[in-house]
Amino acid sequence: MTQWVDQLKETIPDYAKDTKLNIDAVIKRSSLPVEEAEAVALAAAFATGNSKFWTWVHSVLENRTEADAAVTAGSIMAQNNVWYPYIEMADDESLKGLPAQLRMNAIAQHGGTTKERFEAYCLAASIVGKCHFCVKAHYDGLKGMGYSVEQLRDIGRIAAVMNSVSKVLVN
């Protein structure tokens, strides 16, 4: 199932050898199930904003349900990773007290996958999106659902490496 990782590695330039080696390690040897690790990678790729990259990853994943859930998570986190830090940065109690009035149904519906997996995809996208509030909420949520610290670490590792890949791709 992870043949796409080998294809991706071929596009990474030699100056990014660490990234090339890390992409293999974080996905193929993750503590997460393979399908989940791949979809975590896709959610992170989506969050990088490199549409050529994430659409390619989306196209090569075999599990369409997980792939679609990952981009759904990436999409809603693209909104929330901006909205929640904005509220905090504005530092206005009146603003904080107002409802967001933004649709967030994807979170309640889990993008067609399990709640746990959708949370993992949201965490990956939020790590790349650098939203402290979203990272903390999804990290704590997953920990409460039984994810180990090793699994949570691996979500972070996948997100970090996919972010790096998005910056070094030349093809």
Please identify what each model-predicted range represents:
Residues 1-171:
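Hydrophobic alpha-helical segments
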